[in-house]
């Protein structure tokens, strides 16, 4: 699965999301629960704004010194017997992973949750190679066996499905014969996945944060699948975005605390795992061979630009969990594996405006996302910058909008035209006016007034009122 999901036009995706009542209900309920838990967890920690500022400083420092920390990380991974590959593009990353699989003559792969592996289209590349790739995160596994349904949320990928739908998928694909009770569904998935872990030739993981001064990679999970993926297969491949790095475990401690509280409202997740290279002499488990793939895929182009702060993201989805637009349209409407406010900023940077020019407009600019972000990314400001770029640099504004703005500019800059327009506007809008509101506007106002009323022009103009007032004062 590449970064782009689906081929439908943006308006079609949005309409489909709005028409999906179950999805909107599920998203709304999840947002309320996760928001409440996040606020409680933040209050428990205390001095939340100070923690946010500290986390922001850590991420900014890393980005400003990224070359140093990446070099340090690579050196320490190599010192522990691991292999490091820096991939400039998605194709380079997936090709390197495919080559490692070929060298090992591996056919069965288990994989923990990773957004960047979806970004580089890794699963599809390996499946074309004849490999069986099994997602072991429960949400991702459900989507995989349901005809590779795309994820709709960064943290909860199967948020758009209910337990009855999941039961039906299990019955069709896994010969499931029990009820839709979550406990029974989980136990059945567990029994299936355990066999996959034991049979796997290669394990592939993502990386929440890499620790530069030790050469470690970390996995933050609630299911424990990350540990099995990294401990049982003889070969482990970890894939990370080049920005997902911290200087030491001291900074890791701060960021993982912010991550777990912001993502799911927990002090810590059930499992926090740090892996440092292949199995060393005297160690009981772990892979015999370890590969770290560091993915650029457009990230270096963002460094040093007005959008650099988006690379501070720790993938907690706190912005998604407060977004009113996401609440109504869902994750699939964004057409990218990165949805919500963070996706609306990041997707155009990685995939280009031609593919994602609509996403910066999928926002009310209420700034709830910015307030929720644990590393203080100014998301609503970055969305505005995208809009400016789309119009000024890319020339993507619709022709109708350009003509309307030119006409407005011409009329506003000419006293005689402005006077004439303000005189005739009330009469021109009369057929569309009811109770001093335009409820079915013409032309550009049609879509706007389909869901809201537009104030009708006043019949008396300010210039006329002022003229009459001055006349009355003179008569007095």
Swiss-Prot record:
Q: Which GO terms describe its molecular function?
A: 4 iron, 4 sulfur cluster binding; metal ion binding
Which parts of the sequence belong to the 4Fe-4S ferredoxin-type domain? 304-334, 353-382
Q: Where does [4Fe-4S] cluster 1 bind?
A: 313, 316, 319, 373
> Could you tell me the superkingdom of the organism this chain comes from?
Bacteria
InterPro entries listed in its UniProt record: 4Fe4S_Fe-S-bd, 4Fe4S_Fe_S_CS, FTHF_cligase-like_sf, Helical_ferredxn, LUD_dom, LutB, LutB/LldF, LutB_C
Keywords carried by this UniProt record: 4Fe-4S, Electron transport, Iron, Iron-sulfur, Metal-binding, Repeat, Transport
Give the record's GO biological process terms: lactate metabolic process
Query: What is the documented function of this protein?
Result: Is involved in L-lactate degradation and allows cells to grow with lactate as the sole carbon source. Has probably a role as an electron transporter during oxidation of L-lactate.
- Homology family: Belongs to the LutB/YkgF family.
Protein name from the UniProt record: Lactate utilization protein B
> Lineage of the native species?
Bacteria, Bacillati, Bacillota, Bacilli, Bacillales
């Amino acid at each position: 699965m590449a970064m782009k999901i689906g081929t439908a036009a943006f308006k079609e995706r949005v309409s489909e999301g709005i028409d999906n009542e179950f999805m909107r209900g599920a998203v709304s309920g999840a947002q309320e629960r996760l928001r409440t838990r996040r606020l409680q967890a933040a209050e428990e920690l205390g001095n939340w704004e100070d923690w946010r500022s500290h986390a922001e400083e850590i991420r900014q420092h890393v980005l400003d010194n990224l070359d140093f920390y990446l070099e340090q990380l690579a050196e320490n991974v190599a010192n522990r017997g691991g292999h490091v590959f820096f991939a400039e593009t998605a194709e380079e990353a997936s090709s390197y992973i495919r080559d490692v699989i070929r060298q090992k003559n591996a056919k069965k792969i288990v994989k923990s949750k990773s957004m960047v592996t979806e970004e580089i289209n890794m699963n599809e590349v390996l499946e074309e190679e004849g490999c069986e790739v099994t997602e072991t995160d429960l949400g991702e596994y459900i989507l995989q066996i349901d005809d590779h349904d795309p994820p709709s949320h960064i943290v909860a990928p199967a948020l758009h499905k209910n337990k009855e739908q999941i039961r039906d998928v299990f019955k069709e694909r896994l010969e499931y014969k029990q009820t839709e009770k979550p406990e029974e569904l989980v136990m059945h998935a567990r029994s299936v996945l355990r066999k996959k872990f034991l049979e796997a030739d290669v394990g592939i993981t993502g990386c929440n944060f890499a620790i530069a001064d030790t050469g470690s990679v970390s996995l933050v999970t609630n299911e424990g699948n990350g540990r099995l993926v990294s401990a049982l297969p003889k070969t482990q491949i970890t894939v990370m975005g080049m920005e997902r790095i911290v200087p030491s475990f001291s900074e890791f401690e701060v960021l993982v605390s912010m991550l777990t509280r912001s993502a799911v409202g927990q002090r810590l997740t059930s499992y926090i795992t740090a892996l440092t290279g292949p199995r060393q002499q005297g160690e009981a488990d772990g892979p015999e061979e370890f590969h770290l793939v560091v993915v650029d895929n457009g990230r270096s182009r963002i460094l040093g630009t007005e959008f650099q702060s988006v690379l501070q993201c720790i993938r907690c989805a706190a912005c998604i969990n407060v977004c009113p637009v996401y609440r109504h349209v869902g994750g699939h409407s964004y057409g990218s594996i990165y949805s919500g406010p963070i996706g609306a900023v990041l997707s155009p940077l990685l995939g280009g405006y031609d593919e994602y020019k609509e996403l910066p407009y999928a926002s009310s600019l209420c700034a709830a996302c910015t307030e929720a972000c644990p590393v203080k990314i100014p998301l609503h400001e970055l969305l505005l910058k995208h809009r400016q770029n789309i119009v000024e640099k890319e020339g993507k504004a619709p022709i109708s909008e350009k003509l309307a703005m030119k006409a407005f500019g011409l009329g506003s800059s000419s006293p005689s035209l402005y006077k004439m327009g303000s005189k005739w506007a009330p009469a021109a809008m009369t057929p569309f006016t009811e109770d001093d509101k335009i409820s079915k506007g013409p032309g550009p106002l049609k879509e706007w007034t389909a869901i809201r009323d537009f104030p009708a022009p006043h019949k008396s103009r300010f210039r006329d009122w002022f003229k009459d007032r001055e006349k009355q004062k003179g008569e007095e």
